[in-house]
């Protein structure tokens, strides 16, 4: 896999048309890693590419390693919303947004782990964060997703002056993604 003309090539990446994004980035120096909170990478990518949707991302990474690119890396995507980090606001202007297909935080209901959208998650796919006063439960990322995320971040750092890899929970108090499982990755 490589980056040519601000797009990923090879590696099975599927390029979707997302015409709503046209403002150019001037040297992105940040990667923001999100979770989709949805049921599939394809559904999330197709939704984010719709003209009427006021959100987008550069990439969506599926649980089995599927990869979608919606916006070139030199173009602003609408993923960070109202945000600030390192003394700067409006981070869409400085960042590349990567969405990981993941249901996010889970609830324990009647003996089952359930996502906000109502999908039940098998215990083997649950990440338990017991560092706080009460344990919290999260949809586990797949090894394929984590491996692909690392590879893509490495490529992006080779092509752009990336200084930060953060999650929405680092740039706004409205969000909790990508969750505690990726905390060690985000700090690197």
Segment roles from a protein language model:
Residues 33, 98, 168:
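Conserved, mostly hydrophobic/aromatic
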Residues 51-141:
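Peptidoglycan-targeting cell-wall enzymes and recognition modules
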Residues 2-7, 24-25, 101-188:
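Basic/polar, cationic surfaces and motifs that engage anionic cell-wall
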Residues 1-91:
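N-terminal catalytic cores of peptidoglycan-degrading enzymes
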């Amino acid at each position: 896999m490589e980056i040519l003309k601000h797009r990923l090539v090879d590696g099975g990446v599927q390029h979707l048309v997302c015409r709503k994004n046209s403002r150019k980035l001037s040297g992105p120096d940040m990667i923001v890693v999100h979770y989709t909170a949805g049921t599939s990478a394809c559904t999330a990518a197709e939704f984010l590419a719709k003209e009427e949707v006021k959100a987008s991302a550069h990439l969506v990474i599926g649980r089995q390693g599927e990869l979608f690119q919606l916006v070139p890396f030199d173009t602003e995507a609408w993923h960070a919303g109202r945000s600030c980090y390192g003394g700067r606001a409006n981070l869409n202007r400085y960042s590349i947004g990567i969405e990981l297909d993941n249901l996010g935080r889970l609830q324990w209901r009647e003996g089952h782990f359930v996502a906000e959208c109502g999908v039940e998650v098998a215990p083997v796919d649950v990440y338990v964060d017991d560092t706080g006063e009460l344990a919290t439960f999260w949809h586990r990322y797949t090894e394929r997703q984590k491996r692909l995320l690392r590879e893509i971040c490495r490529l992006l750092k080779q092509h752009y002056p990336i200084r930060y890899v953060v999650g929405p929970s680092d740039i706004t108090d409205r969000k909790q993604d990508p969750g505690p499982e990726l905390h060690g990755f985000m700090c690197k």
